[in-house]
């Protein structure tokens, strides 16, 4: 968190292009229809908002860094249906099973227990939710990333990594 607080004012200059590539890769496998409620866990400066906010009933961005949320707040001024929450991804102050789409872009390698984080994401996602998770290649092997998603009981619908610095997985909850 401290790293993101320190770099919040320059985050977009450093990472916007890389983040956009990840988001665009994910959006190729995500239906562009009406979204319902969208959650962006680890929303950072809110780069995802321009891809989903216009088609969503409401988009909620959560981040643990207050300073980076201030940058997201500026971006959210262009999107009246965006709400921001300062919270930990492992303990989100949200109801169960409400989000139709959950995005965790450049998040899980920054959490102490990625499976716990993914389980919390599943808790707030509805039964038919689309869950997008990215994992940096410098943090995970492909096999390790897939194993992590399986350990969290996520079904991988699409997986992309060509030309990216990360793996982009579009998932659903596994039926029990």
Write out the residue ranges for each language-model feature.
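Conserved beta-strand signature within the Rossmann-like core of class I S-adenosyl-L-methionine
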Residues: 128-135
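A short acidic, Gly/Pro-enriched loop at the edge of an enzyme's catalytic core
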Residues: 90-102
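Short alpha-helix
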Residues: 140-152, 167
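Conserved class I S-adenosyl-L-methionine
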Residues: 1-33, 47, 139, 165
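Class I SAM-dependent methyltransferase SAM/SAH-binding core
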Residues: 39, 45-91
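Core SAM-dependent methyltransferase catalytic element
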Residues: 161-176
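A short SAM/SAH-binding and catalytic strip from SAM-dependent methyltransferases
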Residues: 101-113
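A short glycine-rich, Lys/Arg-flanked "PGG" loop and its adjoining helix->strand segment in the class I
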Residues: 115-127
């Amino acid at each position: 968190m401290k790293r993101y607080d320190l770099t919040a004012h320059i985050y977009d200059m450093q990472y916007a292009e890389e983040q956009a590539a990840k988001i665009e890769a994910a959006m190729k496998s995500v239906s562009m229809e009406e979204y319902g409620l969208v959650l962006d866990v680890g929303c950072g400066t809110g780069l995802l908002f321009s891809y989903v906010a216009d088609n969503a009933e409401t988009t909620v961005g959560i981040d643990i860094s207050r300073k980076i949320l201030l940058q997201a707040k500026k971006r959210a001024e262009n999107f009246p249906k965006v709400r921001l929450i300062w919270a930990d991804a492992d303990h989100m102050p949200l109801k169960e099973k409400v989000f139709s789409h959950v995005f965790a872009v450049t998040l899980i390698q920054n959490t102490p227990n990625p499976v716990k984080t993914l389980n919390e994401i599943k808790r707030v996602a509805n039964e038919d939710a689309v869950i997008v998770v990215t994992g940096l290649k410098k943090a995970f092997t492909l096999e390790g990333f897939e194993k992590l998603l399986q350990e969290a009981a996520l079904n991988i619908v699409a997986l992309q990594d060509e030309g990216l610095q990360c793996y982009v997985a579009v998932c659903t909850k596994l039926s029990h």
